[in-house]
Amino acid sequence: FRIPSPSMDPTLKTGDYVIVTKFSYGFGRQSIFDIPIIGDRIFWREPKRGNVVVFADPVTPRQKKLIKRVVGVPGDVIEVRDSLLYINGVMAERDYIGPGSSNADIETSGDFFLETFESQNGKPHEHVIWDKYPQALFDNFGPYTVPEDHLFFMGDNRDNSSDSRSSSLRAVHRKYVMGRAQFVLFSLNIEQTSNRRNKWNRGNPFRWGRFFKGIR
């Protein structure tokens, strides 16, 4: 799976090529063989909060695939207050890392934080997020209860991600889940030009440090 946008930056960067295991959550119509099955999935295993998942866009499932992080499972109440994430009334912890920057963006902006919340197994899950702008569009959202058989997704680049906070997506039904992103196989050094178009830096074509990089 090729990362087409910076919505999961800094975890995943534009130009990363990611290995996805399509058996992680059972099989459905979006799985490798696209075979007709009884119901929407077989051998379903629910993703855990914190998993990075590839899924089909419910509007155009055959044309567009998305990759985001699971922050809500069925029954969870999701809320965002002043950019802080709350799951079932508990605020996800944030620890400051440093100023945000990426070669996919023209300017350094915002800050990186280590975000921690509890997964279904009771263990804490940690990942880095990018909070770029004060009072951004989705800095306040909900509360929203995740419906049965649905998942709530958010991008790690919180102010530059169209995800379940958007009215055009909201929670995604499990039938659209394709698989779990496991690691970056290799990474092309894609930079964003002043008009926001992606350009491959042929003078320095690869991000060698991202080869075989695990995704957490």
Segments from the language model and where they lie:
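Aromatic-capped interface at the extracytoplasmic side
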Residues: 1-8
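Soluble "head" domains of membrane/secretory-pathway proteins
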Residues: 10-216
